[in-house]
Amino acid sequence: MNITTADFFCSYSSLNGLPSDGRPEIVFVGRSNVGKSSLLNSLCARKGLAKTSSTPGKTRLINYFIINDNLYFVDLPGYGYAKVGQGERESWGKLLTGYIQKRGEIALVVLLVDSRHPGMASDLEMMEFLDYCGRPFGIVLTKWDKLKQAEKSKASRTIESCAPNARFIVNYSSLSGSGRDRLLASIDTFTQ
């Protein structure tokens, strides 16, 4: 897959009014501060396409980006952020689960996992939920450049044992772009 155009499309605070034009949706989900926005910017080679922040929980909406005018990348709010109120956390949870359960246009879910913390309970719960919903998913180990070689081997083994149903596992560095081509090729197989 070659990304020639990537533009912000729209943000949604509810499941009402989501695009109904039949374009496939590649969904990016993960814990708060896992690097979803940085990965999207790197993947699309567009700095600033998705707003990044060092503050967890910044993405609070469903953000749509139109790619090559024929598909959407969808950035979902992160899960697992403890510093928001219970009501807001529940609201995000309902938005996220409702979208994943009901959205017919989802072609693939890309689950981002911090390579420094593979196998966290919330990530394992998301994998189970995706399996329960029958959603094909792949895993991207983010922040790969922050690990030493021994840590990389351990992270890979851990995630492989935790995610037997993942269609692919890609090690990714948003800083260097390492893993970009492999991730794009993996996504491409679900948009044909």
From Swiss-Prot:
UniProt cofactor(s): Mg(2+)
A GO MF label: GTP binding
Domain EngB-type G positions: 22-192
InterPro entries per record: G_ENGB_dom, GTP-bd, GTP-bd_ribosome_bio_YsxC, P-loop_NTPase
Binding residues annotated for Mg(2+), in chain numbering: S37, T59
CDD domains named in the record: YihA_EngB
Function: Necessary for normal cell division and for the maintenance of normal septation.
Similarity field: Belongs to the TRAFAC class TrmE-Era-EngA-EngB-Septin-like GTPase superfamily. EngB GTPase family.
Protein name per Swiss-Prot or TrEMBL: Probable GTP-binding protein EngB
Originating species: Chlorobaculum tepidum (strain ATCC 49652 / DSM 12025 / NBRC 103806 / TLS) (Chlorobium tepidum)
Gene: engB
